[in-house]
Amino acid sequence: MIILCLTIFANIFKPGWTGANERTFLAVKPDGVQRRLVGEIIRRFERKGFKLVGMKLLQASEAQLRQHYWELREKPFYNGLVKYMSSGPIVAMVWQGLDVVKTARKMLGETNPADSLPGTIRGDYCVEVGRNVIHGSDSVESAAREISLWFEDHELFCYEECGQHWIYA
């Protein structure tokens, strides 16, 4: 009985979604991969103090992309977005840290690179909204959905970083 209760609580209160354990999903899009920006993007998130807990290079299927961008299905650019995102490999990543969803969105910049400030990823590396280098979850709820779409539980790692005490009080 105790094991059953612990299993239920473990599934209800999953680690990784609040406080310093909050997680977000990022995907370097085909243009970012082709332009060799993956390392620069990882560098920025590591230097900010976030922890990489999952990453893979993959060719996304059209079905997976349609599910990922389901909320945009009525938009005129939807089919083009799916076609573009399946045109080459992407790098899917899960990052963890305090307020990582909100902070990652600020680090990415606006969806339209023309509206992005210098110092943001899109402000520094993009010129066109259709080729804006990177996707990032827009909420904790979206992050949970997107992470479960792109990663299985065994592909995400929990580990203690030796420098974590220098980042979090």
UniProtKB/Swiss-Prot annotation:
Enzyme type, top EC level: transferase
Catalytic reactions of this protein: a 2'-deoxyribonucleoside 5'-diphosphate + ATP = a 2'-deoxyribonucleoside 5'-triphosphate + ADP; a ribonucleoside 5'-diphosphate + ATP = a ribonucleoside 5'-triphosphate + ADP
CDD domains: NDPk_I
BP term (GO), one: GTP biosynthetic process
Keyword ATP-binding: yes
Entry's Gene Ontology molecular function annotations: ATP binding; nucleoside diphosphate kinase activity
UniProt xrefs under InterPro entries: NDK-like_dom (IPR034907), NDK-like_dom_sf (IPR036850), Nucleoside_diP_kinase (IPR001564), Nucleoside_diP_kinase_AS (IPR023005)
Source domain of life: Eukaryota
Cofactor: Mg(2+)
SUPFAM superfamilies per UniProt: Nucleoside diphosphate kinase, NDK
Residues binding ADP: K29, R105, T111, R122, V129, N132
Chain segments annotated as coiled-coil in the UniProt record: none
GO CC annotation, single: ciliary basal body
Protein's cellular compartments: Mitochondrion outer membrane; Cytoplasm; Cytoplasm, Cytoskeleton, Cilium basal body
Catalytic center residues: H135 (pros-phosphohistidine intermediate)
Membrane topology label: Peripheral membrane protein
EC number(s) from the headed UniProt entry: 2.7.4.6
KO phenotype (gene knockout): Morpholino knockdown of the protein results in cyst formation and left-right asymmetry defects.
Entry keywords, A to Z: ATP-binding, Cell projection, Cytoplasm, Cytoskeleton, Kinase, Membrane, Mitochondrion, Mitochondrion outer membrane, Nucleotide-binding, Transferase
Record note on domains: The N-terminal hydrophobic region (1-17) is critical for mitochondrial outer membrane targeting and phosphatidic acid binding.
NCBIfam families: PRK00668.1
Subunit structure: Homohexamer.
Function comment: Catalyzes the phosphorylation of ribonucleosides and deoxyribonucleoside diphosphates, other than ATP, into the corresponding triphosphates with ATP as the major phosphate donor. The ATP gamma phosphate is transferred to the nucleoside diphosphate beta phosphate via a ping-pong mechanism, using a phosphorylated active-site intermediate. Through the catalyzed exchange of gamma-phosphate between di- and triphosphonucleosides participates in regulation of intracellular nucleotide homeostasis. Required for ciliary function during renal development. Independently of its kinase activity, facilitates mitochondrial tethering prior to membrane fusion through its direct membrane-binding and hexamerization. Implicated in repair of both single- and double-stranded breaks in DNA, independently of its kinase activity.
Family per similarity comment: Belongs to the NDK family.
The name this protein goes by in its record: Nucleoside diphosphate kinase 3
Origin species: Danio rerio
Gene transcribed to yield this protein: nme3
